[in-house]
Curated annotation (Swiss-Prot):
Coiled coil: none annotated. It comes from the Bacteria. This is Acetate kinase. Substrate binds at residue 98. Its cofactor is Mg(2+); Mn(2+). Pathway: Metabolic intermediate biosynthesis; acetyl-CoA biosynthesis; acetyl-CoA from acetate: step 1/2. The keyword Metal-binding applies. The active site is at 155 (proton donor/acceptor). It is found in: Cytoplasm. Transmembrane segments: none annotated. InterPro entries: Ac/propionate_kinase, Aliphatic_acid_kin_short-chain, Aliphatic_acid_kinase_CS, ATPase_NBD.
Length: 408
C-alpha cells in the first residue's frame, strides 16, 4: 500500500510517499519520495526540492501565484520527470494530512469528509496560521487525485484526554463552555516519541512515566503516563508555554492589557509581536535560530547569552512542574530540531536536575545522537534523544484506518 503524507505549514509544505507491504514496522522505513516547497526565500516565488530513495533529486524555483497550484506541481513529480516513483496517481491508496487544530470534537484520526473540512475551516480561528494551510493541501489533493481517501491526523488529538484540572483555564467557567480551553499541540510528535522510547527501552508504554521535550522553532513539553498525555505546555494556542524561536510563550496577561491601553497596540500588532518578534529573536535581537544564538554567544554577545539563559530557565521550570503529576520519571526525551541537535541545550537543561541524579554521559551527548540513551548507567532516569518522525506516524494512522475500514 502506497501512502502519501502532506505536512503543511504557513511557509512550507513537506510531503513524502511510503510503501507499507503489511503491518507497519516498528522501525520507520525510508520514504520512496520526499518533497518540500518553501515560500520564504524570495517573494513571489516558491522553491521546490524533491529526492527519491534511489538518489534522484530535483531543485527548482517557480512563480508562487497560487499555493494550491504549487502544491500540485510538487506532487506531480511523483509520476513525472527524473523523480518519478509511480506510473500514475491511482497507485496511491490514501493521503494523510497533519492538521494542527481538531478542537474538542476530534480525539483521533478520521477520514476527511465535507463535515471534517468544515470543522477544520471553523477551527481556523483557533489556528489561523496552520489550519488554512492544511485545507489548501486537502483541496489540492482533491483536484489532483479526485476521490482518493484522505485522512486528517490532528496535532491536538493526543492531548484530548487531559484531566479537566489541566485543561480548564482559571477564568469564568463559560470560557470552557465556549471552547476556550487548553488543547495542546505537537501531539503527533509527542505520541511518536513516547512509542519510540518504549521500543528503545524495551518496556511496555503503559508502564512508563515520560516527559517529551519537542524543541524546534515551536516548543512544547508533554507529561505522559500509561501512554496518555496528562499535562502539556501549549494551551488554547501554540503561543502558550515555553520560550520559543520567535514566540514568547507564557507571559503575564496584564502586560497585554497595558500594551493595549497605554502603548497603542492593536490586536494584530500583539499577534505579530508575540508570534514573530519574541522568544529567542526578541530577547537576542539576532535570530530565532539557536545556531546563530550560539555563534553570537561565542563572539561575546550578552543579549544572546541572556536569551539562552531564559530559554533554559523556562524549560527547566516546565519540566519540574510536570514531575508531581507523574509521581516520578522513567525517561526524559529530547526531540525536534533543537532537541535533537543541541548538545548544549540538553546538558544545560539536565544540569538543573543533577540533585535528583539525572546524569548525562558527555561522551554520548553528541549533536547527532539520535535514537539513543545519553544518560550514564547510574542515572536515576534515562535521557533519550529521538528523531521525531511525524510523517511516519501519520502514515501509520492512515494504514490503520484503511485496515479497519476494509474489515467493517
Amino acid at each position: 500500500m502506497k501512502i502519501l503524507v502532506l505536512n503543511a505549514g504557513s511557509s512550507s509544505q513537506k510531503s513524502c510517499l511510503y510503501e507499507i507491504q503489511s503491518e507497519p514496522s516498528s522501525q520507520p522505513p525510508s520514504p520512496l519520495w520526499e518533497g518540500k516547497v518553501d515560500w520564504t526565500h524570495e517573494q513571489g516565488y516558491a522553491e521546490i526540492e524533491v529526492k527519491t530513495s534511489t538518489g534522484a533529486c530535483l531543485q527548482e524555483k517557480i512563480a508562487a501565484d497560487s499555493r494550491p497550484i504549487v502544491i500540485s506541481h510538487l506532487l506531480a513529480t511523483l509520476w513525472q520527470g527524473d523523480t518519478q516513483v509511480i506510473d500514475q496517481p491511482n497507485e496511491i491508496a490514501v493521503v494523510g494530512h497533519r492538521v494542527v487544530h481538531g478542537g474538542a470534537e476530534y480525539r483521533k484520526s478520521v477520514f476527511i469528509t465535507a463535515e471534517v473540512k468544515a470543522a477544520i475551516a471553523r477551527l481556523a480561528s483557533f489556528a489561523p496560521v496552520h489550519n488554512p494551510a492544511n485545507l489548501e493541501g486537502i483541496e489540492a489533493v482533491e483536484t489532483l487525485f479526485g476521490n482518493i481517501p484522505q485522512v486528517a491526523v490532528f496535532d491536538t488529538a493526543f492531548h484530548a484526554h487531559l484531566p479537566l484540572a489541566a485543561a480548564i483555564y482559571p477564568g469564568p467557567y463559560e470560557w470552557y463552555e465556549q471552547g476556550i480551553r487548553r488543547y495542546g499541540f505537537h501531539g503527533i510528535s509527542h505520541r511518536y516519541c513516547a512509542e519510540r522510547a518504549a521500543q528503545l527501552l524495551d518496556r511496555d508504554l503503559s508502564s512508563l512515566r515520560l516527559i517529551t521535550c519537542h524543541l524546534g522553532n515551536g516548543c512544547s513539553l508533554a507529561a505522559i503516563q500509561n501512554g496518555i498525555s496528562i499535562e502539556t505546555t501549549m494551551g488554547f494556542t501554540p503561543m502558550e508555554g515555553l520560550m520559543m524561536g520567535s514566540r514568547s510563550g507564557s507571559i503575564d496577561p496584564g502586560i497585554l492589557i497595558h500594551l493595549l491601553r497605554h502603548q497603542g497596540y492593536s490586536a494584530d500588532k500583539l499577534d505579530q509581536v508575540l508570534n514573530k518578534q519574541s522568544g529567542l529573536l526578541g530577547v537576542s535581537g539576532i535570530s530565532a535560530d539557536l545556531r546563530r544564538i550560539d555563534q553570537a554567544i561565542a563572539a561575546g554577545n550578552d543579549r544572546a547569552k541572556l536569551a539562552l539563559e531564559i530559554y533554559i530557565h523556562r524549560l527547566q521550570s516546565a519540566i519540574g512542574a510536570c514531575l508531581p503529576h507523574l509521581g516520578g520519571l522513567d525517561a526524559l526525551i529530547f526531540t525536534a530540531g533543537v532537541g535533537e541537535n543541541s548538545a548544549t541545550v540538553r546538558a544545560a537543561t539536565c544540569a538543573g536536575f543533577e540533585y535528583l541524579n539525572w546524569q548525562i554521559d558527555q561522551d554520548q551527548n553528541q549533536p547527532s545522537a539520535q535514537d539513543r540513551d545519553i544518560a550514564t548507567p547510574d542515572s536515576a532516569v534515562r535521557i533519550l534523544v529521538i528523531h521525531t518522525q511525524e510523517d511516519w506516524a501519520i502514515a501509520q494512522d492512515c494504514w490503520q484506518l484503511i485496515q479497519t475500514n476494509s474489515q467493517s
